[in-house]
From Swiss-Prot:
Function statement: This protein is involved in the repair of mismatches in DNA. It is required for dam-dependent methyl-directed DNA mismatch repair. May act as a 'molecular matchmaker', a protein that promotes the formation of a stable complex between two or more DNA-binding proteins in an ATP-dependent manner without itself being part of a final effector complex.
Protein family per UniProt: Belongs to the DNA mismatch repair MutL/HexB family.
GO BP term (any one): mismatch repair
Region feature (Disordered): 357-416, 439-460
Bias-annotated ranges (Polar residues): 402-416
Pfam families cross-referenced by the UniProt entry: DNA_mis_repair, HATPase_c_3, MutL_C
UniProt-recorded name of the protein: DNA mismatch repair protein MutL
Amino acid sequence: MGKIKELQTSLANKIAAGEVVERPGSVVKELLENAIDAQATEINIEVEQSGVASIRVVDNGTGIHIDDLGLVFHRHATSKLDADDDLFHIRTLGFRGEALASISSVAKVTLSTCTDNEEGQQIYVENGEILDQKPAKAKRGTDILVESLFYNTPARLKYIKSLYTELGKITDIVNRMAMSHPDIRISLISDGKTIMKTNGSGRTNEVMSEIYGMKVAKDLVHISGDTSDYHLEGFVAKPEHSRSNKHYISIFINGRYIKNFLLNKAILEGYHTLLMIGRYPICYINIEMDPILVDVNVHPTKLEVRLSKEDQLFNLIVEKIREAFKDRILIPQNDMDKITKKNKVLDQFEQQKLDFEKKQQQENHSQPVNSHEEDEKNDDKAYHSSQTHYEPTDYILKEENNTSVSTSPNSDDDYTQTQKSVLYDLENENQSEFINEADFDSDISNHSDSDIKGSVSKDPSRRVPYMEVVGQVHGTYIIAQNENGMYMIDQHAAQERIKYEYFREKIGEVTNEIQNLLIPLTFHFSTDELMIINQHKEELDKVGVHLEPFGGNDYIVDSYPVWFPTAEAEEIIKDMIEYVLEHKKVNVKKIREDAAIMMSCKKSIKANHYLKNNEMADLVNQLRETEDPFTCPHGRPIIINFSNYELERLFKRTI
C-alpha cells in the first residue's frame, strides 16, 4: 500500500504559515500591504501585548465584495493576478494569495468589510474555516482583528521574543511602510498608547522626522537621478548621524521595502571615507522601474528580489550620494544636550566610585597606603575604560524597572518617547571600530608639505570656513576660532586627508613599468586556491603582479608595478592575492585606494606632536584645499564646531 498522501488543507496552511507568519510583525506587514493595495488613504494599527494577544488593522480602502468573502481565506486566492504574464508586471505589494490563509490557520480572525454600494459584512474564521458570516454596520474599507496568534501551534509561540522586541519589529515595519507611502495617514497604537502617526502629507522627509527626530530630519539631503531604466529618489542623512548597524538603511523598489546586498554596498560606497569602519548611514532610497526588471517572486516574505542591470543601478546610487555631499559643509555641531546627559551619567558613576572607595577605606583601614593607592589606580583605569566606548545616542535609555511613558492623549511626546524606547531595544549595539592613534607607524613623510600642497586643488574650498589658529591641546588637537565660534581640529586626521588625496592622485595612473623585489615573495596555495589563482592569473598579469611557478603548489613574485608605493609593495601584493582568493576577481581601483589610505595613515603626524602656530595654520589652509575636508580616509571627523551659543550655554551665560 502506498505511503504518500495529500495533506489536509488545515495542515498544509499551517506549514505555509511557517514561512509567511513568523511573528506578530509578519501579520502586521501582510495586513498593511493589503490595505495599501486596497487604495486606503488612512490606516490604523492597534496591537495588544505586542500583537500576541491581538492585532487590529482598520483601513478606508475599497473593501471586499460580498461575493469574494468565501474565497478571501483560501490559499492562492487573489485579485491581483490573472494570467502567467501578470507575474512579470507586479505593481501591488501583495500577489501570492497566501497571507490571509496563513494568518487564519494560526489565529482567530474577525473580518468586517464594506464597499461603496453594499451592506457591510462580518465573518469569523478559526483554523482556516469560516465559522460565522453575518451583515454588520461598517464604514467603507476593511477592519481585520487577529486574536490569539499561534494559539494552536504552541511550538511557534515558544519562540516569540520579549514583548518589547516584538513591538520593536512591528514598529520597524510600520515605519518603513510609512516612509514608502507618505501620502497615507498611518498610526500605530500599542496597549492604548500611540507609538507613531503620520499626517499623510505626501512628504517623505516629514515621515522621517516623525521616525528619527527633528535633528536628523534637518540634516537630510535630497537625492534624485535617472537612467534609461531607473528613477531614483531619496534622502540621505549627513555622516554625523551614522549608526552602529545597517538597520537604518531603507531601500524600496516601486514602494516595496527590500533587502539587497549590492544596493547596500552602493550606499556605503557613496559615503566612502565619510563614515568610520563599522558605521552605517540613515537613508531612504526609492527606485522606480518597470516591473519586468525586478523579480519579487523569490521568497514568501517578498523581501528578497532579483534585479536586472544591477551595475547600472549601483553606479547611479553611488554617483547621487557623492553629489549630495560634494559641496556641503559637513562640520558636525557639538551637541550640548548630549554632553549634559553624559555628564549626569558620569557624575552618578563618579559618586558611586567615591562611595565605594570610602567604604573600602573603612573596611581596609589597616591596609598599607601604597596598596590602597594601587587599588585607586586600578579603579581609575576601570572607570576610564568603561567610558572609552561611550556613544551618545538619540534614543531613550532604558532604566531598570522603569519603561513607562506618558499616556496623556494631549502629550506631543507620547508616541515619540515610546517609539524611541522601542527602537533602542531593537537596535544591535555593536561596538564601532575605532582607529587608535598609538598604533600608527611613526614614520614621517618623504614628501614636503609644499609638494603635497601643489597636488591638491588650487581653488580653496569655501566649505571650510576661514579661521584663526589660537593654540593646541595635548599636541593632538588644533584650536581655532572665527566669528561663528570655536573649532577643534584633529591634526592627524587633517594631515591624513591631505596626504590621502595627494597619494591617491600620485598612484592614480597604472603603468606597465615594473620594479624588481630584492627578495622574491613565496606563496603556497591549496588545491582549490590554486584553481582560483590560475583562473585569474591573466588579470593579475595585466596589473603587473606576475606569479611564477616554483614547484608543486608554490609560486613566487619577484617584481611589482612602479605605481605601488615601494615601502608598501609587499603588503599590497599579499592583499591583492587575498582579495582575488576571496572575491574571485582583481579590483585595481580598490588596490590603489587601499594603498593611498595606508600611506597617508603611516606618514601623517601623530598625536602628542607639538606644532608651531604657523605650522598649524599651514595645515588648516592645506585642509581647506582638499576635496573632502571633513573626514579622514577612515571616516573619522576632522573638525568639530562649538558655536558661540553653545559656549555661552556651557558657562551659563545664556539659557
